[in-house]
Amino acid sequence: MAQQKRKKIIRSFLFSATTVIFFFGFVELVFRFSGFEPVFQYKAYAIPSWMEELDPVVLEKYQQFVAGQGFVNEDVYAYEADLRYGYKLKPNISITVRNYSSAYVVDKLPPWTVVSNTKGFRVSSSGEAKTEEKSLHVLGDSSSFGWGVDYEKTYSSLLVEKLNASASSSSDHFELRNLSLPGFSSFQGTLLWQELGEVKNGDWVILSFGWNDSFPSYQTDRQQFESRNSLMGKINWNLRQILFFRWMRTWRLPESGLEYKAGSRVPLTQYRENLEALVEGVREKGAKPVLVSVCNFAEYQDTARQIAGNKNIPFFNFPSSLEPFLPTVHDRFPDQFVTYFEAYGEGMEADPMLVFLFPDRCHPNEIGHGLMAEVLFETFKRKTR
């Protein structure tokens, strides 16, 4: 009798457990097939849940930025969590971004499109480029990613066009491999480099990090990576990839007002070590490194400049290197000049740098990318002869 009762209890338990598993599995399938994207609320704004992977101080500053500009920029929905890098572009996506800059000009700036490949990196809207003898690899942050402009208008894409147009033979043609992502630091650059096996003799590698390295944070990028890839970190991370679980996590209010000691995502000494290691790694493969600083200030810019001098490699500092072009921009880029002048109006007269920058005074716009390509091309042309 007792044994029969025990069997009944076990059957009841198994039935209940199976029902629960089936229910949650069904909900998970519905979420995934419907394209459901969990979000958490900050004031009146819905922020995609993958951003929970960010350092809490970085996330808090983004929330404050959103509240200040009055909307969540559409491009943040192009990303997903990634165990190695924290996040990457969703694979095989195509998204057109319309609201992405200052609220004062959000309806006046042209839209731009983000297209990714199977590995979660940005590519041309026409698909992967054909294989050439040489490659230009770009490891950088949002400016090298081309935030705010189409892929074909980024400085690296325009640079490859110029190099190939001036090449004496097809063996001197380059293909572009842009592995840059917004928010990436030199630490994530070293992680990228460890997986970058296609670099070969005669290639060029642009390294462009600094702004995100110096950004305030609660933990360093290295600490974030080690925590995420510890045993418990991997368990928690894999749980967060279950949409139903991630959706339930969004019910709690996000933390705010975090107290933290002053620190940066990548301390200056680590920044130096990362850049030096990247430069040496490029040279070991027979490729040619170039350091490009965009919106990289103070001691981080000085460090990048010193490394370039010590290693005897080209160094470019943007946007200051573009200032000499200000008097001729309207002749070089007449259509784009009109577009941005109509967007900024008197603001461009008060701040001429808006001719080639977005309102954040940091990211290059289409004109800025065009000028950067011209400046870089002159150096590349001399070095490739």
Residue positions per predicted region:
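N-terminal Lys/Arg-rich, disordered targeting/topogenic segments
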Residues: 1-10
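Serine-dependent acyl-ester chemistry module
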Residues: 7, 40-65, 210-348, 355-359
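Hydrophobic membrane-insertion alpha-helices, especially the h-region
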Residues: 14-30
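Histidine-centered active-site loop/cap adjacent to the catalytic His
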Residues: 15, 35, 338-385
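Generic structural signal for small/hydrophobic residues in well-ordered secondary structure
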Residues: 28, 141, 189, 205, ...
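Membrane/wall-proximal cationic-aromatic binding patches
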Residues: 39-162, 341-344, 351-352
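Conserved SGNH/GDSL esterase-like catalytic core that processes O-acyl groups on lipids
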Residues: 102-122, 135-137, 143-234
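Solvent-exposed, polar/charged alpha-helical surfaces in well-ordered, non-transmembrane soluble domains
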Residues: 157, 161, 187, 191, ...
